[in-house]
Amino acid sequence: MTELVLNPGAVPLAEWKAIYRGASARLAESAWPVIAESAAAVQRILAKGEPVYGINTGFGKLASVRIGDADLETLQRNIVLSHAAGVGEPSPVPVIRLMMALKLASLAQGASGVRVETVRMLEEMLVEGLTPVVPCQGSVGASGDLAPLSHMAATMIGVGEIFVGGQRLPAAQALAQAGLEPLTLGPKEGLALLNGTQFSTANALAGLFEAERLFQSALVTGALSTEAAKGSDTPFDPRIHTLRRHVGQIETAAALRALMSASEIRASHLKEDERVQDPYCLRCQPQVMGAALDILRQAATTLATEANCVSDNPLIFPEADEALSGGNFHAEPVAFAADMIALAVCEIGSIAERRIAMLVDPALSGLPAFLTPKPGLNSGFMIPQVTAAALVSENKQRAYPASVDSIPTSANQEDHVSMAAHGARRLLAMVENADAVLGIELLAAAQGCDFHAPLRSSAALEAVRALTRSKVPHLSDDRHFHPDMEAANTLVRSGAVIAAVGALPGVTA
């Protein structure tokens, strides 16, 4: 397993992606003195005897309740246990590992007041593959992701459950097996662990990374569909897109043109083709997909910033021995980014479904009805297109912006919330739907190109066809379609379709 060294506040998206894909991480050695000084500042602040939110007071609406020194450890344990109130299925392990790494990098910036041993515990859990069981529902994205992060914090004090080595174990048992002792939380530490946007940000980053792969896969399946329909590559001429000026559109057009370069199928209909213009689902791919690329990059910029921030409250400033209360826990930037990703994922799937519909319609594609040599006796791709339509419509419903919703909590003390967690959690499910649509398009486009034999497509697209045919044979007569669709979906989800053609425009570099 790759082990990264995180420089708090300066971690690139590529490293967050690597952690999501399975890498481990430790903090740079330079972080530890900063952490220690922050914890020392908390002790100096306490010595002043003044009320400081979250250190010697209650929480939320109970902030006016002063807590005595003898109860400070109990206060921090209580907030963790009482706030570990999530429901639903466990969040995916890769997402929670990413959440842990995000929290680790945030705590290491010296504004949260936690002790070195507390941060070491979180680091060791990440390195040893101890992943807290975190229910997926329960956060409204302000004050931070309280419930999900509380489930993480609870495992650090030996409460709750942990995934390790494919097993789901009681936290105390999992810690003991790894040679770790449950923590006794010090002043401010419970609040520091559970206050922050790391759950929402981890889910949004996971969605971004998968959406990037989806985008690149759709460039490939879209180009193959254009070939199957004997579409023109003239709409991908760089002169058209230079005038529009949008960078994503320019890069997308260039990629599509390169994917179709030197195609025999394309050359066969350069002359004497009565069609003047292709349907929008072919002709406007650069405009639609380019806009999706641009908006994904905007979301990536926001999430790269959020991933390197401190979203705790209150914040500790050791140089002045001050604790300042603010609102960095409000995840509105993450909510907006998640909404942008959702829109892009929805549109990528939507235009892909339209290409499938075009291919199965002989009036539009010039191919046999439903891409079967014997229409009537065989139904061919009739129902796979219906499945694609169902998936796309489901994604349209899910794409409704989460950030426009809010509901007051904590007796109206927390009266405006971001809904970032909900907005980010839906992304992986949306990508899964869109992946299935692209898998269907991959099969349909490969089938369509088969009808143009012996003419061949470009070298890149022929590699994709060969890959597809290595898993799914040509459809001559109706057969059980589900296994074919699953095989194609695997080619999309694994990134094999992208690997077959080489470098494509991306989001995270």
Swiss-Prot record:
Coiled coil: none
Pathway annotation: Amino-acid degradation; L-histidine degradation into L-glutamate; N-formimidoyl-L-glutamate from L-histidine: step 1/3
Post-translational events: Contains an active site 4-methylidene-imidazol-5-one (MIO), which is formed autocatalytically by cyclization and dehydration of residues Ala-Ser-Gly.
Keywords tagged on the record: Cytoplasm, Histidine metabolism, Lyase
UniProt-listed GO biological process terms: L-histidine catabolic process to glutamate and formamide; L-histidine catabolic process to glutamate and formate
Localization of this protein: Cytoplasm
Enzyme Commission numbers on file: 4.3.1.3
Catalytic reaction annotation: L-histidine = trans-urocanate + NH4(+)
Protein name: Histidine ammonia-lyase
